[in-house]
Amino acid sequence: MGSNIDGILRENLTLEELQEWLTSSEGNKLAIDDHIKATQGRVLPLRLLFNEFLRTISHIEQLSDKTPQEKFQLIRSKLQELYGKLHALVRDFQRLQPLFDTMVPFSETSERKFYPKETLGTAVEPVRPLASPSYRRPSNRSSADTPSSNAPTPSAAVVSGAALVAPQVKHQRRPRTNTAKRQPSVSASVVPSANSSGPATIPGATPLMLSGMSPLNMVASPLNGISPSRKPAQPHHQTTPSAALGMQPMQQKQMSIQAKATPSKSGTISSANLTPQSILNMSAFENSAGGVPNSAVPLNQNNNAIMGFPTDIDNIDLNALELGSLNMDLLG
């Protein structure tokens, strides 16, 4: 019976050939009917065996009386039995596949319609994987079934664009060593310009000796700070030697005019009355009796009238002065 079925149920079987083979002998029709029932009878045992296999795997940890090797052999035997029954079902079903192919043209020409509920026709074809990102790895190759894979992702485009721009940015950077090297030269050039802009006023600088002026007038006396109304000379009133030489003729005229307008009331100073007390009295009298504000008196005139000396410097006899009678305890 099997040989007869294999002889008629071949590939590319047409509906006319099947009808001619079935009508030629009654036994051919019974053979086809028995083979279909045998194949159908293999489905239920296979389902029961598959359910038993799942139950064994789920309760494998509860089999405490068996060793791990025995558990492995139990699962292996169930799996081999399941595989054998499934293989037999597939073999019988594939033998009936040419018969199932004739059902479509028969349903088109006949009033009775037959549609197979189960078929293994796609089993011989390679299974196409689904385009699911959950288990598929991203690949550069694109297939005809997944046209969306041909387009690059936005992240890849951004990364490629950034990779192209990054080298250009590095080449456009300028070295920073030039600015660091220029800073010492700029600072060095600024320092001489500040020194050459004008004379620096140093507080407490010793005034230079001028021609035609007494050395006593240029010496800074410590008694200047003891005077009740005299203010110490500010550092910014000091002048350079060149400016002092230019102002000397004008100062001499002012001193001569002041000497004529304001006669000295303190009398002529001699070695007899040159004491620290007389010097203090002369300095206080000069500041109070002048009647002119200190700001109106020129700075050089105040320097010439220090310690109550007369403005006419030429009349002083320096050789006749005796400084031995000065009380140095006051200065200490």
UniProtKB/Swiss-Prot annotation:
Family stated for the protein in its record: Belongs to the Mediator complex subunit 3 family.
Cellular localisation: Nucleus
Bias type Polar residues, positions: 144-153
Major site of localization recorded for this protein: nucleus
Keyword Transcription in annotation: yes
Protein name, entry field: Mediator of RNA polymerase II transcription subunit 3
Described purpose of this protein according to its UniProt entry: Component of the Mediator complex, a coactivator involved in regulated gene transcription of nearly all RNA polymerase II-dependent genes. Mediator functions as a bridge to convey information from gene-specific regulatory proteins to the basal RNA polymerase II transcription machinery. Mediator is recruited to promoters by direct interactions with regulatory proteins and serves as a scaffold for the assembly of a functional preinitiation complex with RNA polymerase II and the general transcription factors.
Subunit field text: Component of the Mediator complex.
UniProt xrefs under InterPro entries: Med3
Organism per entry: Eremothecium gossypii (strain ATCC 10895 / CBS 109.51 / FGSC 9923 / NRRL Y-1056)
Record field: compositional bias (Low complexity): 132-143, 155-166, 184-200
Gene name of the encoded protein: PGD1
Any Pfam family the entry gives: Med3
GO cellular component: mediator complex
Gene Ontology terms, MF aspect: transcription coregulator activity
Keywords for this protein: Activator, Nucleus, Transcription, Transcription regulation
Segments of this protein annotated with the region Disordered: 125-206, 221-242
